[in-house]
Amino acid sequence: MLTNRQLQILQVIIDDFILSAQPVGSRQISKKQGITFSPATIRNEMADLEELGYLEKTHTSSGRVPSEKGYRFYVDHLLSPQGINSRDIQQIQSIFNDRLVEVEHIIRKSANILSELTSYTSILLGPDVQRHRVKRFSIVPLSSDTAVAIIVTNNGHVENRLFNLPPDFTASDLEKMVNILNDRLIGVSLEELHKSLEAEVLAVLQQHVQSADDFYPRTRNSDNAIIQKAKIFYGGKTNMFNQPEFHDLNKVRMILDLMETTSQVQSLFHPNESGIHIRIGSENKQLEMENCSVITTTYSIGDDQQGAIAIIGPTRMDYKRVVALLDVIRLDLTQAFTKNRSE
């Protein structure tokens, strides 16, 4: 159990180190407003905090820096909510001012603005595309033998896929096909699209549309591409280059390589957990992230779908600011997407 004096000193050290990235000494602490202890007393308390594992001594300075245990204690017990200034709020609100239709546009813009506001790397997962439901299906001919299939989902997600038309496929056939597809597929999830096509739609197409047997295989690969496409959005991938902890290019390269692997990126998230979660250093499962902190949260799209947000930075992350920003943006995203679905 830490004393009140130790708590106060630990908080000052961590707050100062987050701002400066420089070891914090006793004289520096003694000059802080609200600190009434002598440098000698502070040195003794710092030595005790080091012995308890909350601080570490560097080789190049007599000052101390927080340990991973120190950061964990700080996050769990000393982190106080930080207000967001009007400029930050205005920048966040700009995400929603354009009245963009597609969910992906809003998520991509959110990733960029989060990285700008935090100076760290942001990653946003879109909602699970497989759970989207078909809202509208259309086919637009581009030439006598080529067309584009367009699927619009209930979340505003739009997919376009080119394919070749069968020989002798007429405009009348195309119109009949689009009507049948919309009649049978609206409300069907992309996950169930193939099953619905094969179980219900194909037989109807064969009755009313010439070359239906030839047409279906041509569109099947396009549907597979839609379902398998991962929706991950990045902001500020190279922001870590600006942090003194990552002047070692090998460390940065390892993290960038991790971000290129979809399964590794998805493992950073806890999509089934609500609230904000902070993992520090070795608490991350990935070896590449041992010098990083990862803060994650989720946002909702209606009652049945979720997306997720992660901020990646050094363990010397400005936790107060990141948590405050994530708290605002996750609620704003949820509100915006819920409103869009109800309209």
UniProtKB/Swiss-Prot annotation:
Family: Belongs to the HrcA family.
Record keyword Repressor present: yes
Designated name of the protein: Heat-inducible transcription repressor HrcA
Pfam families for this protein: HrcA
GO molecular function, one term: DNA binding
Species this chain originates from: Lysinibacillus sphaericus (Bacillus sphaericus)
Disulfide bridges in this chain: none
Primary role: Negative regulator of class I heat shock genes (grpE-dnaK-dnaJ and groELS operons). Prevents heat-shock induction of these operons.
The keyword Phosphoprotein is annotated on this UniProt entry: no
